[in-house]
Regions:
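Short, acidic (Asp/Glu-rich) active-site segment that either coordinates a divalent metal cofactor
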Residues: 85, 96-99, 209-215, 288-305, ...
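Conserved glycine-rich FAD pyrophosphate-binding loop
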Residues: 2-9, 22-24, 31, 39-51, ...
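FAD-binding subdomain of flavoenzyme oxidoreductases
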Residues: 104-111, 115-258, 459, 471-479, ...
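A conserved active-site cap/scaffold subdomain adjacent to cofactor or substrate pockets
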Residues: 279-303, 674-723
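Generic secondary-structure signature for well-ordered alpha-helical cores
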Residues: 16-24, 70-73, 128-135, 158, ...
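Glycine-/small-residue-rich beta-strand-loop submotif within the FAD-binding core of flavoenzymes
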Residues: 44, 88-124, 128, 136, ...
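Short, well-ordered beta-strand elements within core beta-sheets of diverse protein domains
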Residues: 51-56, 219, 228-235, 287-288, ...
């Protein structure tokens, strides 16, 4: 691996190089000018850079990065400096590239529900711009009024509403970025779906180590018709935690569940006069959102749970002003603790929700042992703790003792099966602990990926990874044995041994997508169907782990017994699809409409790389921002980067009943107009499918008591139509996800699209006899193609679209355009340098 190099340019030569790009007022070198950039929000770390540059255009950023690469000059990209992990701390031998002046919203498309923004745009400004269209940007970190989208992307920021809506990575559809060597890449696009590895999701949370995002395409969501918010005061923290457990056990999925302890409440009152109940040891905030007809009865159930949980005071927000008052203290919690202590460290760990009580008791014990006050604020719904460790840095040894206490809390999170960070990232603060959460092999593989994109580690050097010493290359390819019968490993170790033993392998799961597992005459088939079984299922945590060869149908059956399901609606379950094959192909179904696709529910993976090493990524908790997002990298990777062996997913409570409205519109234009109206509506829809020219299926899910009223409201918008219920309704969607509508012998192709592209695509397809179905309100086309594939290739190339062949003849699985090939090839070199797995 290439060694790190430090620039030899030095400060005297900086003006001549950077001065050709920047005028003096945007090229800062004086000590007083550099002072504001010496730290971010974690002020215990400070460093003075050689210079700060303030670009105003993408071209200036690109030119600066290319200069840094040429001169081996380390650089750090910075937004508003709100990082709480030291993630934007300068490098003393490098420069800071300040991105606040790249602050334009380049496009806001209410029909497609996207915004294209520059990295310096403030988080809250996106929602403000989208508000006239009844849309908003869901991730809501506490610093959303000042933090930038570029920083949110770098650290995969979250917020109070992550349990329902997910984190930044779940809301970024596309990225234009400059890599550390100055190469420009475009990842993803405008569709909710994609072909190939989820490089967009993988880029998010890379903490600036993969270069600088220049443009970010964000997914906007309709503002809920109603919010119902309450706060409940408790005499003990344990009682508040028990209330959370009861809420989850009841199958209620709030938009947010937050808890603040006595010290945090004291700080909030001192700073913002939130008016919270007096004498509370803990305050619980719960918020439901959605259609009024659905939320109101669920909120009544929530109130009964809270009333029975021992709360001594309950307040229900009566209007938006009340709601804002409830959230005011919580949003200002971090900044408020300055009223209690001159200095503080904010921790950011995650534990399984069922172990919150154990974690809080341990924090209390450590606080007493160290005689250091700790205020607790946390996202109780996803187990994300934010202990605020209060100290006075002027006291000798106080900082060191506070850091020691913080470290013990981090290690506790690991010990309890959680993560060392849920949303703040590793940065400088937690570098030493990453190697305690992941083993040496995991770390080496992440570093190989990093160096495949940045050989000299120039981009945000010293962040995320501790010093690792030499990272060896993967082992060499062995002599080629004769190709034998199909291998069928039953254990992970057998998979590792198989990879080490053969120079060329192709993975196969249940055989439901045969075009993706064709092997050349020189490749060994690795059949994973016997690597099967659910390893761990915790209904109370909304998580399970299964081996890659486990049948989707088996998982669905196990989940249904607990009233839970896979919201991304994996396809081909009735034809033997496996969990590993579903992830490798990246195939979500019609039901992804409401809560998202595979990328929104895959939490962790283990895979075998080209050297036969077992590599882990992600975690077994619903919130995690530690290390590179290897789970997203493996989605759609088609076995090109490694052999998946086990996977951890998030699940949700399953709607108790469904109803589908089936309509026939007179033409395509009318059907698309209806789709557009649905996309901008506040309906919580499980699925929206279109079969051209005008047949629509719109699925609702929820409680039996409210479905009838919701169906009436839907009919008021779309027209009467036919209502399908019970077995007839279930069979309709089972046939859709198993592609029973596809004629025998047809090639099955997945094509990511957008609503705006459908008319152009239909101009071509309507001239050809082919069955097809648009899913997810026009974001995904499933095409049963009976003509020559060369003709489809030409159509896709003309329209700038890409397709994935799942079944049918063809030289390869890809059709039309592909993005991210350069990036994928570099990453493949890091994970499979000997080329054991198929090329991408």
């Amino acid at each position: 691996m290439a060694p790190k190099e430090t620039n030899k340019m030095g400060l005297p030569n900086l003006p001549s190089a950077l001065g050709q790009i920047y005028p003096p007022d945007r090229f800062l070198t004086a000590r007083a000018q550099l002072l504001p950039y010496e730290s971010d929000a974690l002020t215990v770390f400070r460093a003075r850079p050689l210079a700060v540059v303030l670009p105003q255009t993408q071209e200036e950023v690109i030119e600066t990065v290319r200069l840094c690469h040429r001169e081996k000059l380390p650089f750090v990209a910075r937004g508003s400096g709100t990082s709480l992990s030291g993630g934007s701390l300068p490098i003393e031998e490098g420069i800071v590239i300040g991105l606040n002046r790249l602050n334009r919203i380049l496009e806001l498309d209410p029909q497609e529900r996207i915004a294209v923004v520059q990295p310096g745009v403030i988080n809250l400004d996106v929602s403000s711009a989208a508000a006239p269209h009844n849309l908003y940007y869901a991730p809501d970190p506490s610093s959303q009024s000042v933090c930038t989208i570029g920083g949110n992307v770098a650290f995969n920021s979250g917020g109070a509403h992550c349990l329902l809506h997910g984190m930044t990575s779940n809301h970024v559809l596309g990225i234009k970025a400059v890599l550390p060597d100055g190469e420009i890449v475009r990842l993803g696009g405008r569709s909710l779906e994609r072909i190939g590895p989820d490089l967009t999701g993988f880029y998010v949370g890379s903490e600036g180590l993969f270069g600088i995002a220049l443009e970010i395409t964000l997914r906007l969501v309709p503002r809920p018709e109603t919010y119902r918010t309450l706060l409940a005061a408790y005499r003990s923290l344990e009682a508040a935690g028990e209330a959370v457990a009861r809420i989850v056990a009841a199958g209620i999925l709030p938009g947010a569940i937050e808890i603040m302890d006595r010290l945090a409440l004291k700080a909030a009152e001192a700073a913002v006069h939130a008016g919270y109940p007096e004498g509370a040891a803990a305050l619980l905030i719960v918020e439901l959102e959605g259609e009024s007809i659905e939320v109101d009865p669920e909120f009544a159930s929530l109130q009964k749970i809270i009333e029975a949980s021992g709360s001594y005071e309950i307040r229900v927000a009566q209007d938006e002003a009340d709601r804002a008052r409830i959230w005011k203290g919580r949003k200002g919690a971090f900044s408020s603790v300055g009223r209690l202590s001159p200095d503080y460290i904010v921790q950011d760990g995650v534990v399984p929700r069922s172990r919150l009580g154990e974690a809080l008791a341990e924090i209390e014990r450590l606080s007493s042992e160290f005689d250091i006050p700790v205020a607790n604020v946390f996202h109780a719904g996803d187990g994300n703790l934010h202990p605020l460790i209060l100290f006075d840095g002027n006291e000798e040894g106080a900082l060191e003792r506070a850091e020691e206490l913080a470290g013990l809390i981090v290690r506790m999170c690991i010990r309890l099966g959680g993560s060392i960070t849920g949303e703040h990232g590793i940065g400088m603060e937690k570098r030493a602990y990453l190697a305690e959460m992941f083993n040496r092999t995991d770390m080496e593989n992440m570093i190989r990926i990093r160096r495949s994109l940045d050989p000299y580690e120039l981009s945000n050097r010293t962040k995320m990874f501790p010093e690792m010493g030499e990272v060896p290359p993967l082992e060499a390819k062995p002599p080629a044995p004769a190709i034998g019968s199909t291998l069928q490993p039953k254990t992970v170790e057998e998979v590792c041994q198989s990879v080490r033993s053969f120079p060329s392998l192709v993975c196969r799961g249940g055989g439901s997508k045969p075009a993706l597992s064709r092997a050349s005459q020189t490749a060994q088939i690795l059949d994973l169907s016997r690597l099967s079984g659910v390893l761990e299922y915790q209904p109370e945590e909304f998580t399970f782990t299964a081996l890659a060869g486990t049948a989707v149908a088996q998982v669905q059956q196990i989940l249904s017994q607990e009233g839970q399901y896979l919201p991304f609606d994996p396809v081909l379950a009735g034809r033997g699809a496996t969990m590993g094959g579903t992830v490798a192909a990246g195939t979500s179904g019609s039901g992804r409409q409401r809560h998202g696709g595979i990328r929104d529910f895959l939490l962790g993976v283990s895979f075998v790389n080209g050297g036969g090493e077992l590599v882990r990524g992600g975690a077994k908790v619903v919130k995690n921002a530690a290390g590179f997002d290897l789970p997203k990298l493996m989605i759609g990777s088609l076995g090109c980067l490694g052999v998946l062996v086990d996977l951890t997913f998030k699940v949700f409570p399953r709607p108790r009943r469904y109803v589908t409205l089936e309509l026939e519109r007179p033409n395509l234009a009318d059907a698309l107009e209806q789709l557009s109206r649905l996309k901008s509506s506040g309906f919580n829809l499980e699925a929206v499918d279109l079969e051209p020219p005008g047949k629509l299926w719109v699925r609702l899910g929820g409680n039996s008591e409210t479905l009838s009223g919701r169906l009436d409201r839907l009919r008021n918008v779309l027209g009467r139509g036919e209502a399908r219920t019970d077995e007839e309704e279930s069979s309709l969607w089972q046939r859709a996800t198993d592609f029973a509508w596809s004629p025998a012998g047809a090639s099955l192709v997945k094509i990511p699209v957008t609503l705006a592209l459908i008319p152009s695509l239909e101009e071509h397809l309507s001239q050809i006899s082919c069955r097809r179905r648009y899913c997810s309100a026009g974001n995904l086309l499933w095409l049963a193609w009976t003509d020559a594939l060369e003709r489809l290739e030409s159509i896709l190339q003309t329209l700038g679209l890409g397709g994935l062949l799942l079944d049918g003849p063809g030289a390869g699985p890809f059709l039309g355009l592909r993005d991210g090939q350069v990036l994928t090839q570099r990453i493949k070199q890091a994970l499979d340098s000997q080329g054991r797995f198929p090329d991408y």
